[in-house]
């Protein structure tokens, strides 16, 4: 199953810059765990996590259901990139 495409379909309407979102899925050696890393701009990361993590938890639940069909445990992680030392 292409977890990267599923995540893109879910988040493209949420983020401001969908073309700058990087998604990488890495499967464990035992084949039962998959770690999906979503990296995007700081503001988009905040949108994906949502207030009190509501959106992130919903995304994790949806992707977990997809993983259950293949007996896989999915871990969804978020990271941001961009200008770290922004000067005013």
Language model regions located:
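RNA-contacting regions in translation and RNA-metabolism proteins
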Residues: 1-46, 55-58, 62-88
């Amino acid at each position: 199953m292409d977890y990267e495409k599923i995540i893109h379909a879910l988040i493209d309407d949420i983020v401001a810059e969908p073309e700058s979102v990087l998604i990488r899925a890495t499967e464990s050696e035992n084949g039962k765990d998959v770690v999906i890393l979503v990296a995007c701009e700081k503001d988009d990361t905040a949108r994906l996590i949502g207030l009190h993590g509501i959106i992130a938890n919903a995304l994790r639940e949806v992707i977990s259901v997809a993983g259950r069909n293949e007996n896989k445990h999915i871990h969804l992680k978020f990271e941001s990139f961009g200008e770290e030392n922004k000067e005013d």
